[in-house]
Amino acid sequence: MKKSILRLLVTLFATPVGMAQAPVKFEITCNDQMTYNSKGFEVTAGQKVSLTLKNVGKIPLKTMGHNLVLLKPGTSLAEFSGKAGAEKSNGYLPQDAETKKAIVAATKRLGGGDSDTITFTLTAPGEYPFMCTTPGHFSVMQGVITVKAK
C-alpha cells in the first residue's frame, strides 16, 4: 500500500501539471484582389489555434483594408455582413449585443504589408465560418474552419 502511494506521488510530481499545449499555427494571406489564399482548415475540438492573417497586398488600409472575423456555426454571413457594413468607425465589427455574440475571434483590419495574429480554442465540433467584413468583400473573402470531435 505504501509503495503504491509512493509510486502515485512520484508520478504526480514527475508529470508537468497544467502544462499548456502549444497552439497549432495557421497563416492565411489576403491581397489587393480581395482573396484569401485558403478557404479553410480542420482542427480538433479543444485544440488551441494561433491564426495569423497577413495582407500581402500593397494598397493601404484606408483604401483596401481586410480582416478575418471568425463566427459561430450557423451564422448567416450575409446578415452579419449587412450589420458590419454600417460600423465603419468600429472597424466594420457590429456593436449590437446580439450580433457580437456570433463573433468567436477577429483580427484587426489590415492594410498592405500588415499582419495580425489571433489565438482561440474551439471546443465544440462544427463548421465555423470566417469572412472579411469590409463592405463588398465577404462574397469572395470567406472560408470555414471545420472542428472535428476528439
Model-found features: residue ranges?
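Sec/Tat signal peptide C-region and signal peptidase I cleavage site
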Residues: P16-Q21
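Extracytoplasmic/periplasmic beta-strand context in beta-sandwich domains
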Residues: H66-N67, G143
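Sec-dependent N-terminal signal peptides
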Residues: S4-T15
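Beta-strand cores of secreted/periplasmic/IMS beta-sandwich domains, seen most often
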Residues: G40-K62, L70, D116-A124, P129, ...
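N-terminal edge beta-strand
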Residues: P23-V49
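Extracytoplasmic beta-sandwich strand-turn segments characteristic of Greek-key/jelly-roll folds
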Residues: T75-A124
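Extracellular/periplasmic metallocenter environments
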Residues: T35, A105-K150
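Short edge-strand/loop segments of extracellular domains
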Residues: L68-A78, F138, V147-K150
